[in-house]
């Protein structure tokens, strides 16, 4: 879990990222109202805040494992950290009675937990075919293989919203 400094930086990052997204929405609104100068300014403000958020994120990202054991780092440490974060926030949401947040975090935790199934710990490598096709639900992050499901098994999103991850590796 992040240190106190990391937690503070994560909070600032989320505030700046949210502000940038809102500026873009306000820019669209200004454009629809025919207020082009305001729309351009709001786009520029949003771009500035995006740059700020990117810099904060680069600090938050932390050290990247450049060793040959990077898969173990991902599957044994980083996934566990994300799951622990979801669990902690789930407890908090349950304690405050925030059922909407409980639902969202439960879905995200399920999607994240599935990711560990792609790693063969015995062999220390991913357990997928070289030509595997991957599909991600844009709402909960569920990762499907082979073909897109008709409905996301985690959040119920329609299959046509689930997109293939294209990569030319």
Role assignments for model-derived ranges:
Residues 1-169:
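Non-heme di-metal
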